[in-house]
Amino acid sequence: MTTAPDSPPTGSSTNPSTNPSTIPSTNPPATLYAVRGGAAWITLNRPDQRNALSAALVNELDAHLSTAIADPAVRCIVLTGNGPAFCAGADLKSPPGQVIDGRQGVTLADVLAHIQDAPKPVIASINGAAFAGGLGLVGAADIVVTVDAAPFSFSEVKIGVIPAVISVVCLPKLGLHHGMKLFLTGERFNGNRAVEVGLAHRAVPAEQLAAAVQAEIDAICAAGPIAVAECKKLVRRVPQLTRDEAFRETTAWSTRMFLSAEGAEGMAAFREKRKPSWVKS
């Protein structure tokens, strides 16, 4: 499996607010960060280790998420991998959450929650193999586009452990039916099957991955930023409510959005047959 042509940007952050002191340094860096066209690209950068989730990598990933969330130029966040794999899972020699230089590391649970709670959409661009803990990133992401031939596996049972933490973000997508079989067997499946079982939204040939991800970025950038953030909350909130609670809460929610400045601008733009202010010309 190879990365798609027109690979994501691999430079350091273009955001001047990034504070290097908040990110433990590794040489080379375990992640890469760049902003392009409204998207912050966070690239897992341990290709020789198949982008395994080390303590340093997860610390950097978490810090980059905070940078992207705080940057008004960033409308969405893209997670991808450098090299032939997306992410092979946790690094068993230096697992996430390990103490580094006397500081407690960010746990896998912490970073998955950070992805889900981010007010900006997180897109997973699956360029290659996604195994075990790496599937936690897939489960936590809001939109998932994958190479059709990329191999997936909840492989934990093969070494006598279980996909415990990542089940929290993967089971809501898989459901009990698919989750049970995939967790029990650790079987491999490809990107097309990932779409069928609910882990991914779209599977494309490798050479089409960049364009497919860009289409998602463009769609998000065309939408109101506050509306997008509220939609993330909406999708997670409604299933927690009873039917009557949901109707009451969403009716009030809808009213707030229609009366908001962003809602007024969007409706005015529609009436005047122009682009709303948040769409860059």
PLM regions and their residue ranges:
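Charged catalytic carboxylate motif
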Residues: A56, E60, T107, H114, ...
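Amphipathic alpha-helical segments at domain termini/boundaries
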Residues: T2-D6, T26-W41, N45, R188-I220, ...
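Terminal peptide-recognition signature
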Residues: I42, R46, E60-L61, L79, ...
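Crotonase-fold acyl-CoA enzyme core
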Residues: A113-I226, L259-S260, A264-A268, R274
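Glycine- (often His-adjacent) and acidic-residue-rich active-site loop
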Residues: G81-I115, A130, L241-T242
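Conserved CoA-thioester-binding segment of acyl-CoA-metabolizing enzymes
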Residues: M1-T14, T18-N82, A113
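Short alpha-helical scaffolding segments that buttress acidic/His motifs in well-ordered protein cores
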Residues: L182-F183, C231-L234, T250, S254, ...
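Conserved hydrophobic/aromatic "anchor" residues
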Residues: L65, F86, F152, F270, ...
